[in-house]
Amino acid sequence: MKKIMWLILLLVLTSILNGCAKEETKEVIGIRGEIKEIYLSEDGTTIAGILVEGEIQEDTMYDSASVRIDENTVVYKGEEEGTIEDLEEGLIVEIIFDGPVAESYPVQGLAKEIKILED
């Protein structure tokens, strides 16, 4: 009887430890589309956000997004790192959001990464 109890306890502990293991999560592209509008900060000196519109594709989640940009947002031009100042209306970009988005229309969220696909 004791052996069965130990076996059950071992199985339960193994299940708990497996459930607590960190899984690697692949970052999901929130939206891929064209920058339609650029929002400036209150003082008008920096880009605070962009409006991106595209189509929902197999690897994207949204077709329209109001994207906030902060000092932690990383911008890439192709494979090289760019700057927020590289963003212009008409560019095609991919957005990876940082955390949850507000499920309004368009969705609203903070950009973790912006990748410029075309000039």
What is the meaning of each model-derived region?
Residues 2, 18-59, 80-119:
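Short, flexible, surface-exposed loop segments at domain boundaries
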Residues 1-18:
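Sec-dependent bacterial lipoprotein signal peptides
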